[in-house]
A protein has these predicted regions:
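Short, conserved beta-strand element in jelly-roll/cupin
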Residues: 1-9, 53-56, 102-106, 116-120
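A generic structural signal for short beta-strands and their flanking turns/coil linkers
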Residues: 4, 21, 32, 46-50, ...
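Ligand-binding loop in jelly-roll beta-barrel domains
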Residues: 13-15, 30-60
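A non-catalytic, helix-rich entry segment at domain boundaries
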Residues: 61-66
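Solvent-exposed alpha-helices and their adjacent loops that cap or buttress functional pockets
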Residues: 19-20, 42-45, 93-94, 115
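Short acidic-glycine-tyrosine-enriched beta hairpin
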Residues: 12-29, 72-75, 109, 115-116
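Acidic/His-leaning functional-site neighborhoods
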Residues: 68-70, 76-120
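Structural motif
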Residues: 1, 26, 51, 79-81
């Protein structure tokens, strides 16, 4: 989950809880099973977010939760890997053949993104 504006509150039966705000990225692996809730804690401010569900490459692993703050709001004409399966520096770990990279660019700015794995 990547919150763009507003806030999203998270609670789960693993004992995790907190508010995810703009700049925060949350990773949750259901693994062997987890009960959780996510909701907008504000009665007046809307929340805008990306929530990606990615199929894991490993089954029956322990459930887990992780969250980190990234300064992507202050990025300009740059990109940052937020989530990866190969322990890239400063990214959150997922158990899937995927990565999530976010870029922030000015209008008409060009960029190149090279895939790290030839099978994609």
């Amino acid at each position: 989950t990547i919150v763009l504006s507003g806030a999203l509150e998270h609670k789960d039966d693993m004992g995790n809880g907190g508010v995810i705000r703009p700049g925060d990225v949350q990773v949750m692996s259901a693994g062997e099973g987890v009960h959780h809730s996510e909701f907008n804690p504000s009665p007046i401010e809307p929340v805008s977010l990306f929530q990606l569900w990615i199929y894991p490459h490993t089954q029956n692993i322990a459930s887990r939760y992780d969250q980190a703050s990234f300064d992507w709001q202050n990025m300009k004409n740059d990109q940052k890997t937020l989530v990866s399966s190969d322990n890239r520096p400063d990214s959150l770990l997922i158990h899937a053949n995927a990565s999530v990279t976010m870029g922030v660019y000015e209008a008409n700015q060009e960029t190149t993104y090279v895939l790290n794995n030839a099978k994609y």
